[in-house]
Amino acid sequence: MVEPNISSYLQNQLKQAQELEENIEKIATQRYQLDLSLKEIEKTLQELNKIDDKTPVYRSIGSILYKVDDKKKLIDELEEQLELTKIRINTLDKQQKSLEEKYKELQAAIRERYNQDNKKGAVS
């Protein structure tokens, strides 16, 4: 809860800090979902590489399963999806790091300004 005697500047800074926290949390959630997807793709590729080329392979689209005629094409698609997922994870990591740095800077600025305002209030 915001104290009523905090300056509007500090209130604005606190609001920005809360927004940064929310964005960091959203990115962490997206990162987690991509990690799950990455593991699933890797596991699928491992299993596909274990089986014989003559073994029938099925792919799930929603609630429908259909037979895959070209296992090699499916593996290529999954490997491409794997690479794209890794790129997205890397991008999210960079975004999260940047937001965390901004958050730390903002935290320091808020703390400094709050201390300055309190000193002024103590002198008055």
Curated annotation (Swiss-Prot):
Pfam families xref list: Prefoldin_2 (PF01920)
Role, per record: Molecular chaperone capable of stabilizing a range of proteins. Seems to fulfill an ATP-independent, HSP70-like function in archaeal de novo protein folding.
Taxonomic superkingdom: Archaea
Top-level taxonomy: Archaea, Methanobacteriati, Thermoplasmatota, Thermoplasmata, Thermoplasmatales
Listed GO CC annotations: cytoplasm; prefoldin complex
Family: Belongs to the prefoldin subunit beta family.
Compartments (UniProt record): Cytoplasm
GO biological process, one term: protein folding
One example GO MF annotation: unfolded protein binding
Subunit structure: Heterohexamer of two alpha and four beta subunits.
Protein name: Prefoldin subunit beta
InterPro entries noted in UniProt: PFD_beta-like, PfdB, Prefoldin
Coiled-coil stretches: none
Record's keyword terms, sorted: Chaperone, Cytoplasm
